[in-house]
Amino acid sequence: MSMQSSDRLLPLVSQKFLATLLLLVLPALLSGCEEGAAPDKDEAKPQAWQLHLKEVKLPANYKPAVQESIYVPVYATIYYENKGRTIDLAATVSVRNTDLKNRIILKKVDYYGTDGKLLKNYLTEPVELDPMAAADFVVPRTDVSGGTGANFVVDWVADTDVSAPLAEAVMVSTGSSQSISFVSRGQVIKQP
């Protein structure tokens, strides 16, 4: 093979290699920019995707042994660099029954915006949370109604003395080349 024919062959091989590489790498790069699948309209309803949660009818004269309200800070949007630039976040509020033997009942899980206005009631009826079980409540990234000062208030009760549940929020954004995630922990705000 002469030097001239190898010089002509090299650009042809390089072009084929680059075309193949582009076909393999481009879809991977583009999928990294994907904002995620469209959310299911029922994704925030625990009954639709957390079948272990059972609705409970509490009698009007129900007297719990323990009851608390937990405030959980949530960030639907955060500022970066200045107040004109924001990142929208998906949030999952997880309420975990830490008691090894006894159930707790979640009476209310409410989502409030930065202005303090109620945005959503996540429960239509109280739900039972078995020992060591968890209940998750999702605010999709596309729901920015809560703003930078959003929060949840979780009201729970128990029939007997129990270990207090743990309530946390996990906020995540993966919509660009950089991802961000952080956690905030709930705090008891009311104990009758």
Regions found by a protein language model. Name each.
Residues 42-49, 143-192:
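Terminal connector regions
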Residues 114-151:
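Intrinsically disordered, low-complexity Pro/Gly/Ser/Thr-rich segments with frequent PxxP/GP/PP motifs
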